[in-house]
Amino acid sequence: MPNATLLNMEGKEVGKLALNDAVFGIEPSKSAMHTVVVSYLGNQRQGTQSALTRAEVRGGGIKPWRQKGTGRARQGSTRSPQWTGGGVVFAPKPRSYRTSVNKKIKQLAMRSALSAKLADNEMLFLDNITVETVKTKTIAEMLKNLNVTEKALIVLSENNEQVYLSARNIPGVGVSYVGMVNVYELLKYKKVIMVKDAAEKLGEVYA
């Protein structure tokens, strides 16, 4: 069972955190992570893109000029794809991009993402994050104390409105919590700052 250094908001070590090896110490599956991320991004799409084909564009029923004798290229319609105002070749139509991924692959992808972040030293563990009043400065100073300058995702054990409101104005910083955090978020951000309770919950849920 891997041990991680536990820090406080001042960036000082306050102890060690025992992590579940089945969640934070596996060989990452790139194919599982890829499958889940592609599915997640596809599910975010509205799928409302639409354009008219040559058959659907209004007009263009008459031949613009005779077939031979003009010296110009032969044309049958002013709504052919090469014409301005013409139809679109293989025009996109509204459709659903949703794909489903089975539970086993989703769980493997989450364990893989957590293990990859830990193996690459891109994960920090805090004993707790406390914000008494909504203040961006509190989170900004915490990041400074932790020497985090890259994009960072803060993972809490449960939804905390004060932490979210305090962090939302800092560019490149996201906030999530157990039950909402996903593989795409973990891979999108360079650093993951996770509180102790969240790590323990994830260790139980995905074991």
Residue ranges: model-predicted function:
Residues A32-K68:
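A short, flexible low-complexity segment enriched in Lys/Arg and Gly/Pro that occurs
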Residues Q44-Q49, Q67, Q75, Q82, ...:
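Residue-identity detector for glutamine
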Residues A4, N8, A18, Y40, ...:
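Exposed boundary/loop context
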Residues R54-F90:
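Glycine/serine-rich anion-binding loops at beta->alpha junctions
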Residues M1-Q46, A91-A207:
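Extended polybasic, low-complexity segments that bind anionic RNA or targeting/receptor surfaces
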